[in-house]
From Swiss-Prot:
It holds the Pfam family HSP70. Gene3D superfamilies: 1.20.1270.10, 3.30.420.40, Actin, Chain A, domain 4, Substrate Binding Domain Of DNAk, Chain A, domain 1. One of its GO terms (biological process) is iron-sulfur cluster assembly. The keyword ATP-binding applies. GO terms for molecular function: ATP binding; ATP hydrolysis activity; ATP-dependent protein folding chaperone; unfolded protein binding. Belongs to the heat shock protein 70 family. CDD domains: ASKHA_NBD_HSP70_HscA (cd10236). This is Chaperone protein HscA. It comes from the Bacteria. InterPro entries: ATPase_NBD, Heat_shock_70_CS, HscA_NBD, HSP70_C_sf, HSP70_peptide-bd_sf, Hsp_70_fam, ISC_FeS_clus_asmbl_HscA. NCBIfam families: HscA, PRK05183.1. Chaperone involved in the maturation of iron-sulfur cluster-containing proteins. Has a low intrinsic ATPase activity which is markedly stimulated by HscB. Involved in the maturation of IscU. It comes from Serratia proteamaculans (strain 568).
Length: 616
């Protein structure tokens, strides 16, 4: 819903005065800013008429260049020219170096392990570099709209995790921007197309940008945009096409020295120019490092065929998650400049069996959708029939006894969402509980990703099972998770907002989902074993307490049979057969039934001692 403006009684709320809002596509390779003017969403160009702003920043001791000017410095001064910084957002230095070992920057670790790049202007980090890009886009919007922005919607890849999303918000704050919402890039594209067409059905959004690939399966119904499933790869995009072609050109040109960053940049620029030319022509001529040769579209297609196939495998997984087939998809929306590559369009069309939609510039469609959403959220539209539902990529839950995972919010649940479950204590007199928040699809804690831990203290010292703790998981519209635990009788409460230090890539998410499928049967067996061991532990602990207080109530036969049944259960718990443990529990239960009945009678007699029948 739109954000409402409230005025003092007797004063006009100036409904005719539009608030200034913008949608920002903060991309890996290029970024854009768009707004709604005269009812139409449009991207805003710079003084030279260029809509795209290269996501590049060049740092010098006393100057800062962003965009095209910075990109021109990349070949001459690569160490001070930061590009594709979005790939580093929310990642540790070790992760960045492992994923991208050939980056021409001088790195150092910050106190929290995040990467810092040493430049002539000092140390900069991915959040600060992103802020410089956002600041340049905001200045462009301010000039075009002749005023400061009241709010922005910034798009992020669908699989950005909490740390990456929070980093984007922090960058916007540093740039002096008020973030109305972070919006998934494929969802923004759906807004750009769906509002105009108003059609209903299943739509696939294929987003292949400079550095990330996302596939989203959406259902459009009566103005409701629901994301059924998402998938992709945060380390796959047009940049990878460029690097493959650059490596091929290096071999053809006989360039052996990989340490010359200037030559590296020239090779990359030549590869980018060739890729663009091959989108319209069957061949193009390349001149680099004294070498001149021809590159054909067929040669380029052969280089990138494996990467394109990887995107289609992700599409197949997303369709399976959504529970739909390719034949059920009505339209395929193409997003990202890399979808201009003829092989990509051809392969995607073949996979889905229909010609992809490209009527909106694939470079601009995400920014346009973000601008439409920003215009609504800032309050320019008092109401809207559009409802937007994103999803979480992996299940969220917490650890229970025995190292088991209790899922509270399943994956692909629409957000924002809040879910709660009740838990209880395991031991008598337990006064504290450790809440361990987990992410993943497996049944055991050891196979899932730990997100956070916090303690709930001050529980009433009741018998096991006496305290009732309500744990609430809440995921906001930006995908950030908060967890609250409250003991119901006392109101004692503790909470935490999950903000992981490091990111989780699409490949790792896909791997976790794949592992859960591959290990489904063994996981079920492991869970059954763990559950029976927990139940056995509970039974043995309860019996130990009963024997400590009422051993005198045992019959002679029970004095022999019960210890034997206890030993049998203890031995069974050392094994790996849940059925054997369950059988041993039942045997022990049968051996202790009469003892339990005598304990109950004795307890009642003690309670009634000294009281008359009338008092009872």
């Amino acid at each position: 819903m739109a954000l409402l403006q409230i005025s003092e009684p007797g004063l006009s709320a100036a409904p005719h005065q539009r608030r200034l809002a913008a949608g920002i596509d903060l991309g890996t390779t290029n970024s854009l800013v768009a707004t709604v003017r005269s009812g139409q969403a449009e991207t805003l160009a710079d003084a030279e008429g260029r809509d795209l702003l290269p996501s590049v920043v060049h740092y010098q001791a006393d100057t800062l260049r962003v965009g095209w000017d910075a990109r021109q410095q990349a070949a001459q001064d690569p160490a001070n020219t930061i590009s594709s910084v979005k790939r580093m957002m929310g990642r540790s230095l070790a992760d960045v170096l492992a994923r991208y070992p050939n980056l021409p920057y001088q790195f150092q670790a910050s106190d929290n392990g995040l990467p810092m790049m040493l430049t002539a202007a000092g140390a900069v980090n991915p959040v600060g570099v992103s802020a410089d890009i956002l600041r340049a886009l905001a200045e462009r919007a301010k000039t075009a709209l002749e005023g400061d922005l009241d709010g922005v919607v910034i798009t992020v890849p669908a699989y950005f995790d909490d740390a990456q999303r929070q980093g984007t918000k922090d960058a916007a704050r540093l740039a002096g921007l008020h973030v109305l919402r972070l919006l998934n890039e494929p969802t923004a594209a759906a807004i750009a197309y769906g509002l105009d067409s108003g059609q209903e059905g299943i739509i696939a959004v294929y987003d292949l940008g400079g550095g990330t690939f996302d596939i989203s399966i959406l259902r459009l119904s009566r103005g409701v945009f629901e994301v059924l499933a998402t998938g992709g790869d945060s380390a796959l995009g047009g940049d990878d096409f460029d690097h493959l072609l650059a490596d091929w050109l290096r071999e053809q040109a006989g360039v052996a020295d990989r340490s010359d960053h200037g030559v590296q940049r020239q090779l990359l620029d030549a590869a980018i120019a060739a890729k663009v030319a091959l989108s319209d022509a069957d061949s193009t001529v390349v001149e680099i490092a004294g070498w001149q040769g021809e590159v054909t579209r067929a040669q380029f297609d052969a280089l990138i065929a494996t990467l394109v196939k990887r995107t289609l495998m992700a599409c197949r997984r997303a369709l399976k998650d959504a529970g739909v087939s390719a034949e059920e998809v009505l339209e395929v929306v193409m997003v990202g400049g890399s979808t201009r590559v003829p092989l990509v369009r051809e392969q995607v069309g073949t996979f889905f069996g229909r010609t992809p939609l490209t009527s909106i510039d694939p470079d601009k469609v995400v920014a346009i959708g973000a601008a439409i959403q920003a215009d609504i959220l800032v309050g320019n539209k008092p109401d809207s029939d559009m409802l937007l539902l994103d999803v979480i990529p992996l299940s969220l839950g917490l650890e229970t006894m025995g190292g088991l995972v209790e899922k509270v919010i399943p994956r692909n649940t629409t957000i924002p969402v809040a879910r709660a479950q009740e838990f209880t204590t395991f031991k008598d007199g337990q006064s504290a509980m450790m809440i361990h928040v987990l992410q993943g699809e497996r049944e055991l804690v050891q196979d899932c990703r730990s997100l956070a831990r916090f303690s709930l203290r001050g529980l009433p010292p009741l018998p096991a099972g006496g305290a009732h703790i309500r744990v609430t998981f809440q995921v906001d519209a930006d995908g950030l998770l908060s967890v609250t635990a409250m003991e119901k009788s006392t109101g004692v409460e503790a909470s935490i907002q999950v903000k992981p230090s490091y990111g989780l890539s699409d490949a790792e998410i896909a791997g976790m989902i794949k592992d859960s499928m591959a290990n489904a049967q063994s996981d079920v067996g492991a869970r059954m074993l763990a559950e029976q061991r927990v139940e056995a532990s509970r039974v043995l602990e309860s019996l130990q307490g009963a024997l400590a207080s009422d051993a005198a109530l045992l019959s002679e036969a029970e004095s022999t049979a019960i210890p034997a049944a206890v030993e049998a259960l203890q031995q069974a718990t050392q094994g790996t057969d849940p059925a054997a443990i369950e059988a041993a529990i039942k045997t022990l239960d049968a051996q202790t039934q009469d003892f339990a009945a005598r304990r109950m009678d004795a307890s009642i007699r003690r309670a009634l001692a000294g009281h008359s029948v009338d008092e009872v």
